[in-house]
């Protein structure tokens, strides 16, 4: 993202910086549909000539071709690639431009050609708009020996036409990227790139040369396609530094006490949590606690816990709270819906209340004591609401920042005081880069859904975070990781973040599915899925249902299809604007749309009350993702149902892990699925091949201390057979 005057926005937040791209009454179509007359805002905007002031050339044409002649020498200077969108550098069209007087015979430039300008040759004349927002003067181009002509239709890595033709910095030869200005290249000027576009980067990210309007099958506004600038998981969080200026400011959450402390109703199986087996590994773990009173929390925290409806601890809370209070690093694995958020928030808040806080709205630089990072915007906002609930009536202030919202709004929230910063990775690194927060006071670093935070999607950003100037080393801070799944390779990566003596807590059948969720696997071909989905949803009625698909385009397609079938449906995925995502979740929560079609952006950590059904229209590529998806139902002891469509052609690799997950959760395993698993993996296949009651175990070699404990009595016990072990969510 280019530099912006955030101080001005902070001082005058009520002044909008948005400038409309087109004003309908400012131009009109001529008789032939080619010419658009426009009254300019200033003479400098369109150039000095009167003919330029009287006309506005509308960029675009959804074509992979460009208007105007191509410099014959250019083919040797840049790749021979077609440009998608307005006025690119591909094939030229003669006599298709816009002229003040008339089209002259043999003139193929046409772009507001002024008869008063004496062009020495066709190449110079065809450039048009010399030394302004459109096409740079031919002599400058020749002298520079490289393609620096503003945004002539967005070639190679430049997404917007009409760049500012600065001969000094539009094209960075060392970086090999062009920076653009103008409506589709710059975010500062809505019409012609009159603002300096040099500081703005191309939006395409992947180097695609996409121009003014949508071309081919790619989406210009959302940036979807194979060179999409948004990440699927975080919905564009990694793309916060690209694209048009974001002006969306999310509405503040309700401030009344009843809304803050609205709580989940526990289900009929909540009391089964006491029978769950827990394994703690590492040196000298502290004893677990049985009640909130044993945690020695301050009275304000105890009052907030009671208001939130918390009456008893879940297994992960019984072990994690004393470990965190003892200052130990922690990696905790617990099934979905098990209260992991409260497990780390309560001891952190207790420490802050006891030791005091440093951040204040009266300080120029905010230095939070705790940073919590999660992979999706929806999840981090959910964590923030929990932090706000538990810190109600205290001096601790929690702040949430995430992508898809105005960066100035995020900064304004921070400067008002920030003790606990809840953030998604991209927006966090943006704010750190702007030097709006300091890291010297960080005492707690929390990674929620840590397996996702450390994989290839966010691993580099997390490593960049812990190496930022001022960030305390892992020996000087306390690092906490929570997730429902912790693959072995992720545990190895975690060594860079955690102290060597960290404790590992595994609760129940970690990495397995909850037995409160009834799982059904149906063998459905790819082209029969839609009809089967409609059949199931009609039988379900208005019960709240989440439908998971693999791609963003399919999410919108299925949602539209279901609406045509008179089934009220909305969708959420990474290409939707943040306001649309929040609106979709709001419609789903309130029951306006009982069906939500989602990609994996909604599979992680979202806690939506009373979701009765999860349907895997497309099975995910990994069994861990399957566990996270079906974990959206059957939470806090409530029951739920998960139905998955199994396609033989695309899902066979999941047969073996599916059989294991179903067996561990004491679910019926279809005979046809066992046959596929047996034929795929051979006669040695076993549904419980690992032989462990814990699906995720500490992978450290020769770690000292390991105990299997029952959460009710906390006595060491022999691990029971999985078939006899009660499960929970």
Curated annotation (Swiss-Prot):
PROSITE patterns found in the cross-reference section: DEAD_ATP_HELICASE (PS00039), HELICASE_ATP_BIND_1 (PS51192), HELICASE_CTER (PS51194), Q_MOTIF (PS51195)
Entry keyword Manganese: no
SUPFAM superfamilies per record: P-loop containing nucleoside triphosphate hydrolases
Residue list for modification Phosphoserine: 224, 228, 727
Start-end of Polar residues biased regions: 29-45, 706-720
Domain annotation Helicase C-terminal: ranges: 532-677
Keywords: ATP-binding, Cytoplasm, Developmental protein, Differentiation, Helicase, Hydrolase, Meiosis, Nucleotide-binding, Phosphoprotein, Repeat, RNA-mediated gene silencing, Spermatogenesis
Taxonomy, superkingdom: Eukaryota
A matching Pfam family: Helicase_C
Reaction catalysis annotation: ATP + H2O = ADP + phosphate + H(+)
Gene Ontology MF: a single term: ATP binding
Gene Ontology CC terms, in alphabetical order: chromatoid body; cytoplasm; nucleus; P granule; perinuclear region of cytoplasm; pi-body; piP-body
Keyword Cytoplasm among UniProt keywords: yes
An example Gene Ontology biological process: gamete generation
Biased composition (Gly residues): 152-164, 204-214
Composition-biased stretches (Basic and acidic residues): 71-80
Residues the entry annotates as binding ATP: 334-341
Domain Helicase ATP-binding: start-end pairs: 321-504
UniProt family annotation: Belongs to the DEAD box helicase family. DDX4/VASA subfamily.
Subunit structure: Found in a mRNP complex, at least composed of TDRD1, TDRD6, TDRD7 and DDX4. Interacts with RANBP9. Interacts with RANBP10. Interacts with PIWIL2 and MAEL. Interacts with BMAL1 and CLOCK. Interacts with Tex19.1 and, probably, Tex19.2. Interacts with RBM46.
Protein name: Probable ATP-dependent RNA helicase DDX4
Species this protein is from: Bos taurus (Bovine)
Gene (name only): DDX4
């Amino acid at each position: 993202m280019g530099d912006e005057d955030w101080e001005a926005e902070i001082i005058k937040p009520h002044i909008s910086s948005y400038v409309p791209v087109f004003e309908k009454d400012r131009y009109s179509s001529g008789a032939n549909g080619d010419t658009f007359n426009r009254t300019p805002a200033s003479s400098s905007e369109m150039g000095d000539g009167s003919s330029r002031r009287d006309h506005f050339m509308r960029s675009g044409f959804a074509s992979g071709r460009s208007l105007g002649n191509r410099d014959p020498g250019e083919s040797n200077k840049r790749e021979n690639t077609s440009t998608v969108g307005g006025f690119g550098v591909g094939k030229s069209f003669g006599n298709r431009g816009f002229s003040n007087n008339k089209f002259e015979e043999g003139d193929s430039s046409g772009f507001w050609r002024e008869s008063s300008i004496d062009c020495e040759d066709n190449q110079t004349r065809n450039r048009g708009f010399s030394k302004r927002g459109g096409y740079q003067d031919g002599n400058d181009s020749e002298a520079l020996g490289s393609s620096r002509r503003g945004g002539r239709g967005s070639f190679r890595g430049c997404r917007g036409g009409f760049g500012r033709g600065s001969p000094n910095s539009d094209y960075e030869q060392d970086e090999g990227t062009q920076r653009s200005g103008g409506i589709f290249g710059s975010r500062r000027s809505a019409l012609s790139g009159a603002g300096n576009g040099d500081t703005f980067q191309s939006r395409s990210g992947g180097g695609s040369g996409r121009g003014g309007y949508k071309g081919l099958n790619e989406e210009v506004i959302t940036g979807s396609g194979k060179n999409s600038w948004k990440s699927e998981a975080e919905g564009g969080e990694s793309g916060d530094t690209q694209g048009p200026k974001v002006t969306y400011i999310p509405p503040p959450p309700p401030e009344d006490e009843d809304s803050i402390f609205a709580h989940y109703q526990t289900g009929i199986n909540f009391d089964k949590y006491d029978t769950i087996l827990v394994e703690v590994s590492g040196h000298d773990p502290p004893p677990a606690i049985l009640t909130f009173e044993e945690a020695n929390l301050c009275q304000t925290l105890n009052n907030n816990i009671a208001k939130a409806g918390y009456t008893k601890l879940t297994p992960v809370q019984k072990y994690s709270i004393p470990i965190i209070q003892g200052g130990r690093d922690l990696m905790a694995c617990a099934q979905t819906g098990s209260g992991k958020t409260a497990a780390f928030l309560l001891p952190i808040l207790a420490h802050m209340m006891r030791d005091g806080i440093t951040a204040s709205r009266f300080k120029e630089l905010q230095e939070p004591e705790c940073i919590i990072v999660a992979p999706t915007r929806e999840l981090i906002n959910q964590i923030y609401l929990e932090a706000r609930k538990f810190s109600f009536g205290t001096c601790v202030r929690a702040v949430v920042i995430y992508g898809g919202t105005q960066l100035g709004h995020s900064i304004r929230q921070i400067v008002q005081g920030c003790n606990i910063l809840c953030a998604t990775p991209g927006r966090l690194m943006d704010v750190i880069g702007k030097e709006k927060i300091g890291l010297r006071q960080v005492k707690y670093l929390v990674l929620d859904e840590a397996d996702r935070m450390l994989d290839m999607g966010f691993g580099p950003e997390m490593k960049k975070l812990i190496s930022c100037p001022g960030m305390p080393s892992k020996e000087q801070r306390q690092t906490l990781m929570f997730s429902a799944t912790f693959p072995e390779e992720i545990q190895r990566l975690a060594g860079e973040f955690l102290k060597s003596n960290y404790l590992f807590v595994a609760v129940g059948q970690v990495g397995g599915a909850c037995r409160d969720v009834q799982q059904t696997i149906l063998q459905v071909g790819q082209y029969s899925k839609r009809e089967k989905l409609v059949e199931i949803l009609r039988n379900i009625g208005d019960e709240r249902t989440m439908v998971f698909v693999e791609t963003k385009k399919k999410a919108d397609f299925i949602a539209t299809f279901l609406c045509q079938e008179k089934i009220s449906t909305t969708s959420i995925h990474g290409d939707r604007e943040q306001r649309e995502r929040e609106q979709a979740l709001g419609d789903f929560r309130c029951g306006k749309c009982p069906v939500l079609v989602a990609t994996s952006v909604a599979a992680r950590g979202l806690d939506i009350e009373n979701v009765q059904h999860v349907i895997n229209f497309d099975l995910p590529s990994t069994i861990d993702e399957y566990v996270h998806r079906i974990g959206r139902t059957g939470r806090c002891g409530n029951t739920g149902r998960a139905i998955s469509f199994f396609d033989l052609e695309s899902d066979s690799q999941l047969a073996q892990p599916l059989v294991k997950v179903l067996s561990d959760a004491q679910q019926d395993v279809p005979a046809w699925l066992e046959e596929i698993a047996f034929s795929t993996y051979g006669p040695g296949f076993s549904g419980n091949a690992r032989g462990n009651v814990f699906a995720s175990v500490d992978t450290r070699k020769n770690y000292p201390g390991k105990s299997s404990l029952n959460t009710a009595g906390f006595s060491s016990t022999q691990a029971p057979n999985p078939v006899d072990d009660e499960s929970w969510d």
